[in-house]
Each structure stands twice: as structure tokens, then as C-alpha cells.
């Protein structure tokens, strides 16, 4: 059972940076629970406000429901209540409800509702999907506005009235006008989370629209850098934030953009660079080439000593 009411959950996840761990695989691509838990233990030495288990960076799309349950249970066990664990739900409405029920049974504290899979629907249909999922669980729900699951301020306002446990809004669209309209209409009703790939890029402008946190993929392998950047953003230290963007984030994004799917692959590559390998990605994703891995290694070395990052 969650330690948080939905409103308490919403408050907690808005207080700091959110961790978005990769899912560890063995060479045969099976889930490596021991390595996953050991890595979470290391990450806990760096302060975060919440943890997304088996999320997008955790290759949710490549996990079976049983594997997802194992990952969530491992995260719950390893965190030991130190921070909220956010479990994924996705695909069609019926499956999303089952994921929510499994998350509750596993002891997760909240739900990240990912977009439905391989279907197109009207905003009214998407809103109905979100409402049904929210009403199937007692946990606080974060809706991920992305791909084929994009809601505007009108639909979100109605959902907020009908679903008290819909407490989070994660943006993966990057439409500043839409974000402005949503925040102007809903205000503090939601906790707003940045959810674009390499969310650091959007952190400064999004802060002015109520987005107090984001899920950081680079926290996986350069946690101190990620936390320092987040602190600079929250302190409105634009000079420091832009320097950090130029030193690491923007070159990192250029490497990430080499191939579709690298938003996940490059994070696992970063883990390998610091000596904390999480294994390969599962198909249809592909790992970075050796040459690209060397480029990433040079980027990481530019910002800090690798041994200190892995200590």
C-alpha cells in the first residue's frame, strides 16, 4: 500500500529532481534484478524526489507485464520507503487498468499513464481512457501528454473535476503555448513534470510555466551533474545553466540524435562509460557503436573525473 495520499504524492514529486532509471539486462536480455537493485542503492546516495520504475527509459515498451511487475517490486523493496516509486501503465484501457492493479499490489506510490499503443483517437476518446484508468486505482496518477495522448486545458479541467487522483501532468510535447494555457487554467491543481527527451534542455523556460521538476535520464550516469544543473535552474542561475548546457547537454543531445531510439540507448551507454553497465538494450532499440561510445566517454570525462562519478 502506498505511503502517500494522491495529494501527498503530488507534493512530494514536485520537491526535487525525478530519477528515471534504466532496466538492467543480462547478456541473454533477461532482467538482472540484482544489478538493478544495486544500481538503485547507488542512485539513492544522490538526492531525488521520486523514481520512475520501468518507465520509458526503463524500456517499458519491451517488458512483459510480468517483468514490469518484477521491476516495480524490486524498486519498492530497494527504496524501502525512502522516496516514492512511480509505476507505469499503458497500452489499451483494459491493460492500463491491470497495470494499475498490479502496481497497487506491488506497493508502488503512483502511476505514470503512458500513451495508448498503436492507435489514433480523438481527444474525447483519450480523455475517456484517462478517466477510466484513474477511476480504477487509488494511487495518484500522472498523465503523460505525448504522441497520441495529447489533452488540452479544457479536457484536463474536466478530468481534474472527475478524477481527484489525477494529480500530475507530464509534458512530452514541447508546445509552449499549450503549456501556458494549461498552467493558466489549472494552476496548482497538478504537479507539472518536464518529460521531453533530455528534459534539461527545456527546464529553464518550463519553470516559468509551473514545471518545477522533470525526469532526468542523465541522472543515471552523471547524477551530481544532473543535480547541480537542476539547482542552477531552480535558483535562476542562467549563466551557470547555459554553461552546463554547452559543456555537456547540447553535445550529448547531438550524439543522441544520431539514430532513432538513442534517447534510451545513450543512457545505457553512459552507464557503461562510468563502469556501472546495465547491459544491452532490447530490440528494436540498438546500442551505440564503439566509436559513439568513445565520443560519449570523452563528453563525460569533460565534466568530471569518471571515478568520482561512479564512487
Curated annotation (Swiss-Prot):
Pfam families: DHDPS
Annotated GO biological process: D-glucarate catabolic process
InterPro entries with a match to the protein in the record: Aldolase_TIM, DapA-like, Dehydro-deoxyglucarate_dehyd
Keywords: Lyase, Plasmid
Catalytic reaction list: 5-dehydro-4-deoxy-D-glucarate + H(+) = 2,5-dioxopentanoate + CO2 + H2O
Pathway membership: Carbohydrate acid metabolism; D-glucarate degradation; 2,5-dioxopentanoate from D-glucarate: step 2/2
Keyword Metal-binding among UniProt keywords: no
Enzyme Commission designation: 4.2.1.41
MF GO annotations: 4-hydroxy-tetrahydrodipicolinate synthase activity; 5-dehydro-4-deoxyglucarate dehydratase activity
Family per similarity comment: Belongs to the DapA family.
Record-linked PANTHER family: 5-DEHYDRO-4-DEOXYGLUCARATE DEHYDRATASE 2-RELATED, DIHYDRODIPICOLINATE SYNTHASE
Protein name, UniProt field: Probable 5-dehydro-4-deoxyglucarate dehydratase
Species for this entry: Ralstonia nicotianae (strain ATCC BAA-1114 / GMI1000)
Organismal lineage: Bacteria, Pseudomonadati, Pseudomonadota, Betaproteobacteria, Burkholderiales
Amino acid at each position: 500500500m502506498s505511503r502517500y495520499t494522491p495529494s501527498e504524492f503530488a507534493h512530494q514529486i514536485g520537491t526535487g529532481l525525478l530519477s528515471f532509471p534504466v532496466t538492467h539486462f543480462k547478456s541473454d536480455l533477461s532482467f538482472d534484478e540484482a544489478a538493478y537493485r544495486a544500481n538503485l542503492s547507488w542512485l539513492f546516495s544522490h538526492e531525488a524526489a521520486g523514481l520512475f520504475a520501468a518507465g520509458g527509459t526503463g524500456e517499458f515498451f519491451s517488458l512483459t507485464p510480468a517483468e514490469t511487475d518484477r521491476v516495480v517490486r524490486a524498486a519498492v523493496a530497494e527504496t524501502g520507503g525512502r522516496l516514492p516509486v512511480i509505476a507505469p501503465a499503458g497500452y489499451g484501457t483494459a491493460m492500463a487498468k491491470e497495470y494499475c492493479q498490479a502496481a497497487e499490489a506491488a506497493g508502488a506510490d503512483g502511476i505514470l499513464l503512458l500513451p495508448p499503443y498503436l492507435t489514433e483517437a480523438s481527444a474525447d476518446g483519450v480523455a475517456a481512457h484517462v478517466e477510466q484508468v484513474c477511476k480504477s486505482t487509488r494511487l495518484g496518477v500522472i498523465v503523460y501528454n505525448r504522441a497520441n495522448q495529447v489533452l488540452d486545458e479544457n479536457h484536463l479541467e474536466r478530468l481534474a473535476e472527475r478524477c481527484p487522483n489525477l494529480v500530475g501532468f507530464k509534458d512530452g510535447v514541447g508546445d509552449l503555448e499549450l503549456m501556458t494555457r494549461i498552467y493558466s487554467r489549472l494552476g496548482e491543481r497538478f504537479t507539472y513534470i518536464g518529460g521531453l527527451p533530455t528534459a534539461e534542455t527545456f527546464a529553464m523556460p518550463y519553470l516559468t510555466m509551473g514545471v518545477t521538476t522533470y525526469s532526468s535520464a542523465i541522472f543515471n550516469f552523471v547524477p551530481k551533474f544532473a543535480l547541480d544543473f537542476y539547482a542552477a535552474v531552480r535558483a535562476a542561475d542562467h549563466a551557470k545553466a547555459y554553461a552546463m548546457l554547452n559543456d555537456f547537454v547540447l553535445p550529448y543531445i547531438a550524439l543522441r540524435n544520431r539514430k532513432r531510439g538513442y534517447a534510451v540507448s545513450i543512457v545505457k551507454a553512459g552507464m557503461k562509460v562510468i563502469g556501472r553497465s546495465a547491459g544491452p538494450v532490447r530490440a528494436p532499440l540498438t546500442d551505440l557503436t564503439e566509436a559513439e561510445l568513445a565520443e560519449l566517454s570523452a563528453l563525460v570525462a569533460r565534466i568530471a573525473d569518471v571515478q568520482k562519478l561512479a564512487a
